[in-house]
């Protein structure tokens, strides 16, 4: 871990400290900001080497997930060595890591293996293997999404992927839910529009809500017979839903799809609450806002026009909302987000989320400029430790993508 006071400017608040966590000559990255990759005590997290902000190459032997121990000055310890390791999730108790081994091929299938290992590298075991067409699926599973999500009770792990037969364009994608105690898997969602699901379990301890998953539906997308995208989204854009992890109780969130506002494709639960948050882009006025809402009964794909929708623009007190990737702490009280200008290296902002769901964030604090080139493979993707005391981000300001940490406000 290397101190980086040169990344702090006169505009940064007093006491801010920036550290570069990775320093290798090959790209290193944090996991996508919505992933559950922190221990609940905020002491250890997972990141990866020979990687980028949206995943890694499953055939890259240099790719590894690492445990970063903040109590030991950011000491890194490899936690995976297998080829094709992907989609990590730390259990809510913080004792074990779940991850997948991707040995699949579109149209052919292969093996998708759910594994578990203690964070000290011991007791590694296979939990479940998918090596044939899952009942109800249109084809073999392949192209696993580089993120998984784990339920608040640690009993279920979900991941999405491609279900094409290798000969049909615009074939279905689907969402798998693995039941850890029984070592079984179920296909709970399937269709051509579920190509970029971003599944995220609700972290609420409420028995019913703990089965809920935020899922993203990309309308108007196109892909070839191998699942490669020719168009990620079309028409009025994506909309965001919530579904129970048995595939029932589909609900809507009132965002986007009105011809002016669109969902960027970044959303999350606000901490362990049942409130949800997304970043939107508007044509007029040209802004990128942070809008919270709660779910509504499913009536279709109406977006913000969904009847009964109640929205709260958390970013309305910011003088120039231009927000994209964001995350909250575990309690849903603190938020970190990146912002434009993209051609100026971007910016990191911090704010406090009101408990009153009608109020906006009022204490916006500019932290720093990450110095990012803001290409897809260098996205900043900021997130917070569970206790909200420290933030994390990616940057290629050195010429090579690296992982960073910023703190000093608490």
Give residue ranges: language-model regions.
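A short helix->beta-strand "capping" segment at the edge of beta-propeller domains
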Residues: 9-29, 362-365
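Blade-loop segments of beta-propeller domains
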Residues: 27, 31-34, 52-102
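Blade-terminus and WD-like Trp-Asp/Gly-His loop motifs, strongest in beta-propeller folds
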Residues: 35-44, 49, 88-101, 142, ...
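Short, conserved, GDST-rich strand-edge loop motifs in beta-rich repeat architectures
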Residues: 49-61, 100-110, 159-171, 215-237, ...
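Asp-box/WD-like beta-propeller blade repeats and closely related beta-sheet repeat scaffolds
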Residues: 79-173, 187-195
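Conserved blade-ending motifs and adjacent loop-strand segments that build the rim/top face
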Residues: 254-263, 312-326, 358-386
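Loop/turn-rich, solvent-exposed surfaces of beta-rich toroidal or solenoidal domains
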Residues: 265, 270-290, 296-301, 311-360
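Blade-level signature of beta-propeller repeat domains, shared across WD40, Kelch, NHL, RCC1
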Residues: 378-410
